[in-house]
């Protein structure tokens, strides 16, 4: 539900985004698989949506992997679990 609500808000504000975008993961030039990004906003920011107790190092490492695969410098982890929205900015 959080994803759909955020997509609606972005759409109403005219902010371009792609939901569930697949990005290729490569290692030494070889294709290994894909990551599926929750949102790519404005072709610049990777957004990952969570509903967890706390954002931890695993979530940050996951975002860094997404940033590397998508070749984007900035990502946001949005955690909806604790009543108030928790936002963590991650820079590659």
Language-model features and meaning:
Residues 50-92:
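Nucleic-acid nuclease catalytic cores
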Residues 3:
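Nuclease catalytic cores
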Residues 17, 37-55, 66:
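Conserved catalytic cores of phosphodiester-cleaving nucleases, focusing on short active-site segments
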């Amino acid at each position: 539900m959080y994803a759909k609500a955020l997509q609606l808000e972005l759409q109403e504000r005219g902010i371009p985004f792609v939901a569930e975008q697949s990005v290729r993961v490569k290692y030494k030039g070889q294709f290994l698989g894909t990551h599926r990004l929750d949102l790519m906003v404005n072709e610049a920011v990777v957004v990952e949506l969570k509903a967890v107790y706390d954002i931890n190092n695993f979530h940050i490492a996951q975002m860094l992997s997404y940033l590397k695969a998508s070749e984007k410098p900035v990502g946001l982890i949005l955690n909806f679990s604790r009543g108030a929205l928790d936002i963590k900015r991650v820079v590659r």
